[in-house]
Regions:
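C-terminal non-catalytic interaction/assembly regions of soluble proteins
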Residues: 62-182
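Accessory alpha-helical/coil subdomains and C-terminal extensions
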Residues: 1-97
Length: 182
């Protein structure tokens, strides 16, 4: 989702800065970037992935007062925007607001496309079908088979090959400073 925020830049509304876990986050560089952009535009829009880590390899969100682990024993991600907002306010004295999209993105059915709705419905239908055939520990996957016309197929993949794995964003997609997507 954080990388996808870059798409709005093509219409002139995208974030000024984008931070993702694949690049080490440097607080001093971040504050410098925010200060520079704010001095030019009087506003700064930042998109941040919850999993960003500092130079010591620690999740930035660990600076929160409350932390817990997920079912795999990993730190439950969330709230990094608030941490950064507090730092910007404290260090730069700028007015800040943090918006966390985690719940909004899951509950905004009013902005779903017809394709989103159709594919979600068909994935659920396919999942029930394979379950009734006796399959368990599988995940329904959607693969595009054609762009024109647009077509997809539904298959199953062992859950063990998906859960608890990360597919990183290629370094070639991240600018040298690590504060945006190319």
């Amino acid at each position: 989702l954080t990388c996808a925020s870059k798409l709005s830049s093509y219409a002139g509304y995208g974030p000024d800065l984008i931070y993702i876990p694949e690049h080490t986050f440097c607080l001093n560089e971040f504050l410098e970037d925010v200060k520079n952009i704010y001095s030019k535009k009087q506003k700064v829009l930042v998109a941040v992935s919850e999993g960003i880590r500092d130079e010591d390899g620690n999740y930035l969100l660990q600076k929160r007062l409350y932390n817990q682990n997920d079912n795999f024993g990993h730190l439950q991600l969330g709230g990094v925007g608030v941490v950064l907002a507090e730092m910007v306010n404290k260090e730069l004295g700028l007015p800040v607001r943090s918006v966390e999209l985690n719940i909004l993105q899951r509950s905004a059915a009013h902005i779903l496309s017809k394709t989103d709705i159709t594919e979600a419905y068909n994935a659920g239908k396919y999942g029930i079908k394979i379950y009734l055939k006796g399959y368990t520990d599988k995940m329904v996957t959607i693969s595009r088979t054609s762009n024109s016309p647009y077509r997809v197929k539904y298959t199953i993949t062992p859950l063990a090959s998906i859960a608890n794995y990360v597919k990183p964003v290629p370094n070639s997609w991240i600018n040298e400073r690590g504060n945006n997507i190319t």
